[in-house]
Amino acid sequence: MRYHLSALVLVFTAFRETLTAPTPGNNTIPLPNRLLHQWPNGTWVENISVRPNGNLLVTTSTPDGSVWQVKEPWKENPEVERVFNFDEWVDRLIGIGETQDDKYVVVGSRFYSTDAQSSHVARTFCAMELDFSGNTTEPSARLIAWMPESYLLQGVAALPWDRDTVLISDQYVLRPRAVQIDWTPSPGQIWVLDTRTGEYGLVMTDYAELNTTYAKGPDVGIDGIKIRDHDLFWVNQDDSGIYRVKIDDAGVPVAPVKPQLVASYNTMWDDMAFDPFNENVIWATGLNAVFAATLDGQIVPVDGVGTSDNLTLPGPTACAFGRTEKDKSILYVTGNLLTVPESLLDVKLGGW
């Protein structure tokens, strides 16, 4: 068995027939796919966002906290370049989300080492902005806010009606030290951040549906988040659930707060994307597979483990649909391998 970290972007053709009714017997499953780009060993690609021009932006956690761009990803061999290194503020990046057109919030922190399983340094998480709106080829960047009370900032989602305000998921992982010594189950939480002023605050915590329980080992709870209309959706890596809750115009859950279980599947969720054609379908990355889930609770793996092609998906971390006429039916997936065994049926994920 080899041990290294390898990062990649995969492309999946998401046929509308599959989107409409994902079922285990669908003869389009597994979906057609191809490898779009693979970074050198030692690179950890964590999250993805799609620019208005269709280019992909991906964040890296190793060897440094950078944003990379995959240009015109619908091409056979797209150009890939680093567009910004955030080393002034962080060692690693995790989440990325678009606010205004071609403006993005990224989150990250200092870490004890560049090792893939290194712990973050306590009280060093922050939110930063990457701005292409003034120059589409050479973005500017700024620090929005230090968020020292946070633990492991993860997903970023803008409020659709106020895109300068974002919600950020926070995985309470007790690892702000070089060696983990406490595996007490811990709560997850969600922050709201005004990107104009840098003001932030907690909007949701102390709910079992957000929490880390370590049911699957030293894993995290709440992970990727998305907002559609006034519904906040999230995945919980630890308890296998996809959830949603109503939020108000300030991004605060509407009382009485009772998170709704949308769907459940025995996997380790990481992130999700809304279907561009069918509001009843969510796409999500899990343990070495991509899944399609309906809001009435149906879930089916569409690529990777659980289909006839178990070797497609090594450690997927995030996914996003294309935004142009050329690729609006294409799902782009980032992935990492931390431990590379002979079979992906037992692979260990390399993402948060």
UniProtKB/Swiss-Prot annotation:
SUPFAM superfamilies: Calcium-dependent phosphotriesterase (SSF63829). The keyword Glycoprotein applies. Glycans are attached at residues 26, 41, 47, 135, 211, 310. Pathway: Secondary metabolite biosynthesis; terpenoid biosynthesis. Eupenifeldin is a bistropolone-humulene meroterpenoid first discovered as an antitumor and anti-leukemia agent. This metabolite also shows anthelmintic activity against the parasitic worm Hemonchus contortus, anti-malarial activity as well as antifungal activity. One of its GO terms (molecular function) is isomerase activity. PANTHER family: NHL REPEAT-CONTAINING PROTEIN, NHL REPEAT-CONTAINING PROTEIN-RELATED. The keyword Ligase does not apply. This is Putative hetero-Diels-Alderase. It is an enzyme of class 5 (isomerase). InterPro entries: 6-blade_b-propeller_TolB-like (IPR011042), Hetero-Diels-Alderase-like (IPR052998). GO terms for biological process: terpenoid biosynthetic process. It comes from Phoma sp. Residues 1-20 form the signal peptide. Disruption phenotype: Abolishes the production of eupenifeldin. Its EC number is 5.5.-.-. Keywords: Glycoprotein, Isomerase, Signal. It comes from the Eukaryota. Gene3D superfamilies: TolB, C-terminal domain. Putative hetero-Diels-Alderase; part of the gene cluster that mediates the biosynthesis of eupenifeldin, a bistropolone meroterpenoid that acts as an antitumor agent. The first step of eupenifeldin biosynthesis is the biosynthesis of 3-methylorcinaldehyde performed by the non-reducing polyketide synthase eupA. Oxidative dearomatization of 3-methylorcinaldehyde likely catalyzed by the FAD-dependent monooxygenase eupB is followed by oxidative ring expansion by the 2-oxoglutarate-dependent dioxygenase eupC to provide the first tropolone metabolite, tropolone stipitaldehyde. Belongs to the eupF Diels-Alderase family.
